[in-house]
């Protein structure tokens, strides 16, 4: 039996730990628009160039979800397909993936396909994909993989830190005055994905050190006691080191992985930001 794990670019991972003929990974890109320029969030995207373009532009920025056809093409070619999308509260990606699932089953009623709304993005999606890979490599049945990943999702969370809010200001979600104050006072916004998939602000911290302390405080409130962590950062390896050191000082056996944010997550987290997934 052959498997595919399919995500959109709300996931930061570009590949699995080890792909094989039996298990492949497909990432369906969203597109990002800055003024009249369009960037496709695939492996060829120069994220640094995209971010420079964004900061140099005064125009509003937008993202567009993949088409059902793009998902359908990614689904084909495997007996078992597990699909995961960025939270449906922020994007139409989940709906496109659902329409493509229906089309695939019309083409091939014998294929097994399961669709997951991550209710999240970034680091939490990354953790879920890595767990899917682990479960599949155990040789479990399709039904058992679905059962176990569903249970696992109840034990994962997302916390984020924003160092810049240019995009929020440009798109009218924050006033220019608030944006300027945040920049001048070096304020970091600390928030989370709710269990409904919406993003919520938890704390405002002045400076990176206080933001790290706030992050640790919030994950402990959620029930973190040393589980796996995946930190996806936007040009900020320093904060990854600070968070990792603090977690390790409290929970020496914690397994922590880090990586760069995808184009989409960089687009919204902005330079210096992060999206961290963790187990409770």
From Swiss-Prot:
One of its GO terms (molecular function) is lipid binding. InterPro entries: DegV, DegV_C, DegV_domain_contain. Signal peptide: none annotated. Keywords: Lipid-binding. Hexadecanoate binds at residues 63, 91. Residues 3-280 form the DegV domain. Gene3D superfamilies: 3.30.1180.10, degv family protein, Dihydroxyacetone kinase, domain 1. It comes from the Bacteria. May bind long-chain fatty acids, such as palmitate, and may play a role in lipid transport or fatty acid metabolism. This is DegV domain-containing protein SPy_1698/M5005_Spy1391. It comes from Streptococcus pyogenes serotype M1.
């Amino acid at each position: 039996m052959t498997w595919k794990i399919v995500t959109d670019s709300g996931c930061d991972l570009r590949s699995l730990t080890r792909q094989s003929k039996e298990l492949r990974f497909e990432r369906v890109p969203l597109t990002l628009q800055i003024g009249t320029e369009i960037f496709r969030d695939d492996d060829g995207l120069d994220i640094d160039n995209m971010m420079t373009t964004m900061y140099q532009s005064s125009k509003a920025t937008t993202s567009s979800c993949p088409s059902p056809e793009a998902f359908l093409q990614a689904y084909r070619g495997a007996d078992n397909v597990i699909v995961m999308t960025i939270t449906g509260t922020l994007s139409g990606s989940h709906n496109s993936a659902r329409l493509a699932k229906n089309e695939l089953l019309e083409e091939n009623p014998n294929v097994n396909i399961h669709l997951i709304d991550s209710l999240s993005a970034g680091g939490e999606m990354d953790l879920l994909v890595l767990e899917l890979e682990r479960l599949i490599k155990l040789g479990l049945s399709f039904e058992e993989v679905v059962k176990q990943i569903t249970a696992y999702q109840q034990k994962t969370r997302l916390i984020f830190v924003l160092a810049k809010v240019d995009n929020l200001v440009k798109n009218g979600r924050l006033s220019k005055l608030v944006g300027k104050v945040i920049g001048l006072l070096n304020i970091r916004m600390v928030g989370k994905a709710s269990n409904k998939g919406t993003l919520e602000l938890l704390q405002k911290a002045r400076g990176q050190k206080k933001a790290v302390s706030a992050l640790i405080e919030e994950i402990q409130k959620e029930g973190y006691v040393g589980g796996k962590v995946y930190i996806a950062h936007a040009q900020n390896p320093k904060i990854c080191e600070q968070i990792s050191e603090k977690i390790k000082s409290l929970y020496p056996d914690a397994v922590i992985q880090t990586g760069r944010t995808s184009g989409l997550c960089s687009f919204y987290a902005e330079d210096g930001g992060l999206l961290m997934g963790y187990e409770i």
